[in-house]
Amino acid sequence: MALIKKTFFFLFAMFFILVQLSSGCQAGLDFSQPFPSGEFAVCESCKLGRGKCRKECLENEKPDGNCRLNFLCCRQRI
């Protein structure tokens, strides 16, 4: 009985780790964690989740405000 319970919790934990890794961002973090180089994660969202904080916007995005440090809030062009 204890072996079944341990196996269940192990598989449950592995499922959430795989889901977190496949999303591309660190799921569950309310605040962006700086990388060792001091830069913030590219996947940080801005403008109520409609944009992404980046150093430079992609070709199909336009700058729409500022994020932390010297990052731009980039939104998709419509």
Curated annotation (Swiss-Prot):
Disulfide bond annotation, renumbered to this chain: C43-C74, C53-C67, C57-C73
Role according to the record: Has antimicrobial activity.
Key words, A-Z: Antibiotic, Antimicrobial, Defensin, Disulfide bond, Secreted, Signal
Presence of keyword Acetylation: no
UniProt similarity note: Belongs to the beta-defensin family.
Superkingdom, natural source: Eukaryota
Principal localisation: secreted
GO annotation, cellular component aspect: extracellular region
InterPro entries documented for this protein: Beta_defensin_dom
Localization in the cell: Secreted
Gene Ontology biological process terms in this record: defense response to bacterium; innate immune response
Pfam families, per database record: Defensin_beta_2
Name of the featured protein: Beta-defensin 105A
Cleavable signal peptide: 1-27
Species this chain originates from: Pan troglodytes
